[in-house]
């Protein structure tokens, strides 16, 4: 049978167009409502598997981070403090991108990076830390906490020493470059029996310590005493000197024994080489500053540090506790404060 298909009538075409238009508008409104609802929800932070595993929790709420302030030594202290306090308080820890850019090229750190776009949407509770552990830090309130200050004290994280050492494990190529240099060193034609890393902090501290903090930096006498301490206890030691004031070191460190090597490049903007050299030694001589403290902490062995380098009324002692900075087993040699007493 032949069926003839007639065109829609004019009213029927309008009716179908009307239904289609209404349906489209309805679905678009539904979609927009869902999107708006998503934006109005509180920020949901995914808990990364690596973070949960590292912090010993299968499910953690909220997010903790820390300000990335200062150079390498400061940021190592901030990272380790965040790692320890977040774990202590049962919170997931995330580091700022700036901190990741400083530490990741040198160390095998594991804490995830905080996306800057996400960070800007989080209602942070800023929580200031002293440079030493306080009992109240075991119970810091808040799910979204940003730690502030310049924490760099073993009192925060020494109970997790093994984990901290793992976090600050050098990348293979960084470690191998340092070891290759050390393997080529000799003392009076023979291979050294002991490697002692020496870090001499100069730079801004030369002026800041006496003018601002009523303190001193290491002088020639201190370094001579520190080197002699190791010479008296170890056979054929070699002293690997790094500094941001290498010219001063060459003029003030006694090289007559043939056991001193000026090895570092002193470039503060790229400290990996100097730091790696120090940590691949057996022992440490440090002066002041977090760079030397961390080199000694990672190295282990014997450590000599500059002690009592401020006057008793120094404002520095209000923000810095020597007993919280230097491990009890380290050996301090008192600084010569006489230059301060002349003024």
UniProtKB/Swiss-Prot annotation:
Record-level GO BP terms: carbohydrate metabolic process; fucosylation; glycolipid metabolic process; protein glycosylation; regulation of cell adhesion; regulation of endothelial cell proliferation
CC per GO annotation: Golgi cisterna membrane
Intervals, Cytoplasmic compartment: 1-14
One function term, GO molecular function aspect: alpha-(1,2)-fucosyltransferase activity
Keywords: Glycoprotein, Glycosyltransferase, Golgi apparatus, Lipid metabolism, Membrane, Signal-anchor, Transferase, Transmembrane, Transmembrane helix
EC code: 2.4.1.69, 2.4.1.344
Glycosylation sites: 188, 282, 308
Topological domains, Lumenal: 29-343
Catalytic activity: a beta-D-galactosyl-(1->3)-N-acetyl-beta-D-glucosaminyl derivative + GDP-beta-L-fucose = an alpha-L-Fuc-(1->2)-beta-D-Gal-(1->3)-beta-D-GlcNAc derivative + GDP + H(+); a beta-D-galactosyl-(1->4)-N-acetyl-beta-D-glucosaminyl derivative + GDP-beta-L-fucose = an alpha-L-Fuc-(1->2)-beta-D-Gal-(1->4)-beta-D-GlcNAc derivative + GDP + H(+); a neolactoside nLc4Cer + GDP-beta-L-fucose = a neolactoside IV(2)-alpha-Fuc-nLc4Cer + GDP + H(+); a neolactoside nLc4Cer(d18:1(4E)) + GDP-beta-L-fucose = a neolactoside IV(2)-alpha-Fuc-nLc4Cer(d18:1(4E)) + GDP + H(+)
Entry's localization field: Golgi apparatus, Golgi stack membrane
Record's bilayer topology term: Single-pass type II membrane protein
Spans through the membrane: 15-28
Pathway: Protein modification; protein glycosylation
InterPro entries, sorted: Glyco_trans_11 (IPR002516)
Family (UniProt): Belongs to the glycosyltransferase 11 family.
PANTHER family assigned: GALACTOSIDE 2-L-FUCOSYLTRANSFERASE, GALACTOSIDE ALPHA-(1,2)-FUCOSYLTRANSFERASE 2
Record's function text: Catalyzes the transfer of L-fucose, from a guanosine diphosphate-beta-L-fucose, to the terminal galactose on both O- and N-linked glycans chains of cell surface glycoproteins and glycolipids and the resulting epitope regulates several processes such as cell-cell interaction including host-microbe interaction, cell surface expression and cell proliferation. Preferentially fucosylates gangliosides GA1 and GM1 in the antrum, cecum and colon and in the female reproductive organs.
Protein name: Galactoside alpha-(1,2)-fucosyltransferase 2
Organism: Hylobates lar
Gene transcribed to yield this protein: FUT2
């Amino acid at each position: 049978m032949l069926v003839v298909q007639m065109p829609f009538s004019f009213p029927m075409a309008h009716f179908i167009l009307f239904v289609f238009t209404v349906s489209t508008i309805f679905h678009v409104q539904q979609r927009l409502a869902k999107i708006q609802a998503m934006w109005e929800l509180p920020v949901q932070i995914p808990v990364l598997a690596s973070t949960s595993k590292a912090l010993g929790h299968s499910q953690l709420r909220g997010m903790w981070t820390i300000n990335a302030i200062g150079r390498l030594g400061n940021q190592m202290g901030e990272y380790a403090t965040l790692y320890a306090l977040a774990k202590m308080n049962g919170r997931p820890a995330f580091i700022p991108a700036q901190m990741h850019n400083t530490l990741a090229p040198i160390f095998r750190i594991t804490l995830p990076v905080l996306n800057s776009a996400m960070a800007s949407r989080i209602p942070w509770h800023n929580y200031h830390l002293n440079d030493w552990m306080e009992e109240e830090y075991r119970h810091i309130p808040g799910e979204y906490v940003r730690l502030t200050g310049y924490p760099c004290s073993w009192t925060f994280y020494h109970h997790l020493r093994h984990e901290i050492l793992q976090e600050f494990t050098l990348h293979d190529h960084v470690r191998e470059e340092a070891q290759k240099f050390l393997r080529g060193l000799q003392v009076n034609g023979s291979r050294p029996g002991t490697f002692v890393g020496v870090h001499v902090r100069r730079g801004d501290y030369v002026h800041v310590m006496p003018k601002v903090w009523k303190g001193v930096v290491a002088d020639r006498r201190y370094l001579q005493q520190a080197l002699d301490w190791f010479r008296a206890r170890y056979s054929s030691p070699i002293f690997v000197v790094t500094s941001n004031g290498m010219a001063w070191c060459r003029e003030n460190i006694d090289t007559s024994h043939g056991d001193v090597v000026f090895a570092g490049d002193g470039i503060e903007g790229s400290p990996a080489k100097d730091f790696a050299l120090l940590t691949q030694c057996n022992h440490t001589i440090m002066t002041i500053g977090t760079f030397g403290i961390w080199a000694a902490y990672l190295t282990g062995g014997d450590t000599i540090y500059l002690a009592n380098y401020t006057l008793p009324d120094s404002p520095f002692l209000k923000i810095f506790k020597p007993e919280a900075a230097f491990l009890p087993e380290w050996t301090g040699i008192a600084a010569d404060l006489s230059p301060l007493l002349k003024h």
